[in-house]
């Protein structure tokens, strides 16, 4: 939680225009916190509330040589025990996948118990993999596969209990040559409940369609009263 925003940020319906970040972090600059380089408006929030805020025409690119891990989002990169309410994003976020990235139109990675409500994104989200990531293994350096996770609202959540309610996604998700669960609301979620959510676009896919989900790949929880383009409903 060191360096995280803690408290209440009320945007009072203001809009941040043209948020720009094309920066990355290389391994030679690593510190004890594993270089959690931040690209979103809020790099990290902890026990916080962010509400009533819009971001329009964002332009975020995470370079291929970036070695920081985990969450990348337009509004928040890393979210812990926090709440986001009545916020939206437009623009684009593009991830290079030198190391795993969890990329979301609103928030990148959720840690612990979190709530996101009354939010939407129409952002273009892109994941890429250049096949040039090597890691130290027994016997020397070996090429490694990278496991990204991309979602219209949230990239991924692995711990805690999360509720995403009254949210919708209307942008696009493009994944090029990468192993990645892809979802219109969340890429991968464990302990995530989705309620009253909508995916209003068919522009969602990756090289392996078996990893693509209208709402998201969710374990241990479910979705209620949610809709996606083929007019099906999941209860």
PLM segments and residue spans:
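Predominantly extracellular beta-rich ligand-binding scaffolds that present long acidic/polar faces
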Residues: 1-235
């Amino acid at each position: 939680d060191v360096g995280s925003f803690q408290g209440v940020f009320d945007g009072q319906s203001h809009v941040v225009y043209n948020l720009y970040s094309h920066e990355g972090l290389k391994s030679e600059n690593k510190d004890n916190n594993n270089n959690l380089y931040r690209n979103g408006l809020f790099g990290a929030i902890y026990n916080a509330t962010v509400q009533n805020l819009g971001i329009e025409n964002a332009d975020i690119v995470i370079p291929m040589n970036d070695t920081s891990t985990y969450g990348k989002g337009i509004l928040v990169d890393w979210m812990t025990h926090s709440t986001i309410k009545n916020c939206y994003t437009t623009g684009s976020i593009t991830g290079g996948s030198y190391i795993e990235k969890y990329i979301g139109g609103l928030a990148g990675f959720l840690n612990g118990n979190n709530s996101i409500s009354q939010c939407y994104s129409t952002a273009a989200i892109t994941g890429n993999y250049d096949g040039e990531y090597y890691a130290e293994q027994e016997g020397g350096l070996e090429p490694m596969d990278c496991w990204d996770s991309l979602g219209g609202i949230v990239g991924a959540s692995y711990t805690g209990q999360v509720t995403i309610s009254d949210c919708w996604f209307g942008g696009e998700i493009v994944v090029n040559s990468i192993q990645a669960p892809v979802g219109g609301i969340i890429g991968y979620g464990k302990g995530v409940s989705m309620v009253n959510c909508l995916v209003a676009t068919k522009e969602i896919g990756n090289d392996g369609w078996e990893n693509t989900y209208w709402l998201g790949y969710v374990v241990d929880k479910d979705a209620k009263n949610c809709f996606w383009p083929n007019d099906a409903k999941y209860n």
